[in-house]
Amino acid sequence: MAKTYDPNNVFARILRGEIPCKKVLETEHALAFHDINPQAPTHILVIPKGAYVDMDDFSARATEAEIAGLFRAVGEVARGAGAAEPGYRILSNCGEDANQEVPHLHIHVFAGRRLGPMITKG
């Protein structure tokens, strides 16, 4: 089932230039910018320029060029932030149970300190 994309979500508005961002990288298929509420010393969001709700939507509908472009941008952002060594974490929440807050696919790049366990047991 196709997911409904909200063209007025905050990331769509950033892509259209309606809301400013602290840009890190822009490519043909991706935009990366600093998170406004960082959870680590380095916390950068990487988003596709296309209208995709989440990773499920993106993996089903994106072109090969968009997929490669997004993931290459994630790597370029991590390297540019000096995070390739000693390491970094990437995370993308998909859907309500994962607590996805913005209905536009976004990949978090966290770095700059030891990050600890991925999730808490519950």
Curated annotation (Swiss-Prot):
It comes from Azospirillum brasilense. Gene3D superfamilies: HIT-like. Residues 10-120 form the HIT domain. InterPro entries: Histidine_triad_CS, Histidine_triad_HIT, HIT-like, HIT-like_sf. GO terms for molecular function: catalytic activity. It holds the Pfam family HIT. A motif (Histidine triad motif) lies at residues 104-108. It comes from the Bacteria. This is Uncharacterized 13.2 kDa HIT-like protein in hisE 3'region. SUPFAM superfamilies: HIT-like (SSF54197).
